[in-house]
Amino acid sequence: MSGSTGERPFSDILTSIRYWVIHSITIPSLFVAGWLFVSTGLAYDVFGSPRPNEYFTEERQTTPLITDRFNALQQMDILTEGL
């Protein structure tokens, strides 16, 4: 049999009151923080993704696809000129 690592068994941790006191606060807090991050629109700003109402402009109502890989830069310039 191999030696003990000196750590507490996982079953002892899960049945301890201290574990549940700490995690009953942190788990809901993480959920609320994530919900606020997305619902306030901060996630769009941090990651630079367009908001749902910015995918299509008034002039361009088609999907902005790059179709020619050799002229992709020119197509990107055309697609993003109104932004």
From Swiss-Prot:
SS bonds (residue pairs): none
Biological processes per GO annotation: photosynthetic electron transport chain
SUPFAM superfamilies xref list: Cytochrome b559 subunits
Its membrane topology: Single-pass membrane protein
The family this protein is said to belong to: Belongs to the PsbE/PsbF family.
Self-association and partners: Heterodimer of an alpha subunit and a beta subunit. PSII is composed of 1 copy each of membrane proteins PsbA, PsbB, PsbC, PsbD, PsbE, PsbF, PsbH, PsbI, PsbJ, PsbK, PsbL, PsbM, PsbT, PsbX, PsbY, PsbZ, Psb30/Ycf12, at least 3 peripheral proteins of the oxygen-evolving complex and a large number of cofactors. It forms dimeric complexes.
Cofactor remark: With its partner (PsbF) binds heme. PSII binds additional chlorophylls, carotenoids and specific lipids.
Keyword Membrane attached: yes
Annotated residues for binding of heme: 23
Origin species: Nephroselmis olivacea (Green alga)
Cofactor: heme b
Alphabetical list of InterPro entries matching this protein: PSII_cyt_b559_asu (IPR006217), PSII_cyt_b559_asu_sf (IPR037025), PSII_cyt_b559_CS (IPR006216), PSII_cyt_b559_N (IPR013081), PSII_cytb559_asu_lum (IPR013082)
GO MF term list: electron transfer activity; heme binding; iron ion binding
Protein localization: Plastid, Chloroplast thylakoid membrane
PANTHER family in alphabetical order: CYTOCHROME B559 SUBUNIT BETA-RELATED
Major localization class: plastid
Protein name: Cytochrome b559 subunit alpha
Record field: transmembrane: 21-35
